Regions:
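Proteins with a high burden of low-complexity, intrinsically disordered sequence enriched in S/T/G/P/A and R
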Residues: 1-2, 50
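Substrate-binding/catalytic lobe of Class I Rossmann-like enzymes that use SAM or dcSAM, i.e.
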Residues: 25-134, 138-139
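Alpha/beta-hydrolase-fold catalytic nucleophile elbow
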Residues: 22
Length: 139
């Protein structure tokens, strides 16, 4: 489905248009996801590898920039966890203990996956091969 997705993106872009892909990625290519994540967090979700992305865009786009924010994303998720646990008491009347445990588990698991660098948060700037638009990527 990655190739089909990028073909649609290209079709929607103007000739000089650029596309920023913001995605969580993994080191190893896979065609399945964790059953728990599939059921409770991201139904039909999939994290692509760099190889799957580059294979899907070949001939459709050129890569202008590829940045990995993964090492910093651990801190973001830990802030979400802190806020979630801090404010859960005010949410308790709408969400049960199971909900609290599931989201605590998910946030801590996610933070660990970025801390260990098994997951990455990528922003990939793409342009069409014939484009003369030299977009600057700011860091």
């Amino acid at each position: 489905n990655y190739r089909k997705y990028f073909k649609v993106v290209r079709h929607c872009l103007e000739k000089e248009g650029t596309f920023l892909l913001h995605t969580i990625g993994v080191e190893e290519s896979t065609t399945s996801t964790d059953p728990w994540v599939e059921k409770y967090i991201f139904p039909n979700g999939m994290m692509p590898s760099s190889r799957q992305i580059t294979g899907a865009i070949e001939g459709l786009f050129k890569i202008d920039d590829w940045h990995n924010f993964g090492p910093h994303y651990d801190k973001t998720i830990m802030c979400w966890h802190k806020n979630f646990t801090k404010h859960y008491q005010s949410l308790k009347h709408n969400y049960d203990e199971r909900f609290f445990r599931m989201w605590t588990y998910w946030l801590l698991l996610s933070a660990a996956s970025f801390r260990s660098r098994s997951n990455h948060l990528w922003q990939i700037l793409l342009s069409q091969p014939g484009s003369n638009n030299l977009t600057s990527a700011f860091r």
